[in-house]
Amino acid sequence: MTQTRLHFTTGKIEAERIFAALELAFEDEGLPIAVLEVDEDQDIHEVSLYADGDVDTVEARVKDILAGLALSKPVEREVLPDIDWVARSLEGLKPVRAGRFFVHGAHDRRKRHSGELAIEIEAGLAFGTGHHGTTSGCLEMLEKVVRREHPRNALDLGTGSAVLAIAVAKLAHIPVLATDIDPVAVKVAAANARLNHVKALIETVTAPGFHHPIFGRRAPFDLIVANILARPLMRLAPQMAGHIALGGSIVLSGILERQRDAVISAYVGQNFRHVRTLYREGWVTIHLKH
């Protein structure tokens, strides 16, 4: 999908205020936001927001935010070339080891050690290569949970590349439902499941949250993993409680360290209890039981 960069210049102090406001406003969408120093002597900083889909609506929201800060800036657009940045970045990435898991691209197949569970991720347009602190944290946590609890029916909500669904399938040899709101991600997930020889265990479905008939047929789950963002995770707490089996576990990530307590509180309010937290690169992975 073609991406558009919305950008404007301002001073450093204003740029920091704007960045904080944009980050808060677009947290649910997960739109990338950046501030670049253009000229230190002249105090010129460029603020950029990267959008796809309805760019007009995003630009209007940006202008409303600027107006709310009593700032008026001409917002410019730059249409970026349609490049598969995940594919390009994977070309130079080293494999990742997280617990027993070895996540790699095709170019590193031979680097697997004896006893490791290898997951090969085809370069694609879906998030989740194992290199991000949230994904590696989830892999480590899943190994602990599966080893101790022996789940029989799992859900990977917001599957992205399906790296976590594949991890559960390989580790526990159980059926896994892998869902995502993005149909492109679902196609990538299915391809990666085939590539890793677990397609028979992983069912991939395009679904926003829990809004799909498949959940009525497959629930309750005794293991749910969701590596998305803190605010959507908090909103999903009641639905998580409605789809988890009694005594089941959920593994949550995509959460900044400063967001940890708020996420845990949302789930404690739905009769979950906190088991443990893993900290990785400023992010946390949380294990809770129902």
Curated annotation (Swiss-Prot):
- Write down the chemical reaction(s) this protein catalyses: L-lysyl-[protein] + 3 S-adenosyl-L-methionine = N(6),N(6),N(6)-trimethyl-L-lysyl-[protein] + 3 S-adenosyl-L-homocysteine + 3 H(+)
Q: Which GO terms describe its biological process?
A: methylation
What class does this enzyme belong to in the EC scheme?
transferase
Q: Where in the cell is it found?
A: Cytoplasm
What's one Pfam family the UniProt record gives for this protein? PrmA
Tell me the domain of life: Bacteria
Cellular component per GO?
cytoplasm
Known EC number: 2.1.1.-
Keyword check for Methyltransferase, yes or no.
Answer: yes
Ligand binding (S-adenosyl-L-methionine): T135, G158, D180, N227
Q: Which GO terms describe its molecular function?
A: protein-lysine N-methyltransferase activity
What InterPro entries does the record point to? Ribosomal_L11_MeTrfase_PrmA, Ribosomal_PrmA_MeTrfase, SAM-dependent_MTases_sf
Q: Which keywords fit this entry according to its UniProt record?
A: Cytoplasm, Methyltransferase, S-adenosyl-L-methionine, Transferase
Coiled-coil ranges per the record?
none
According to its UniProt entry, the function of this protein is described as: Methylates ribosomal protein L11.
HAMAP family registered for this protein in UniProt: Methyltr_PrmA (MF_00735)
- Identify its protein family: Belongs to the methyltransferase superfamily. PrmA family.
Which named protein is this?
Answer: Ribosomal protein L11 methyltransferase
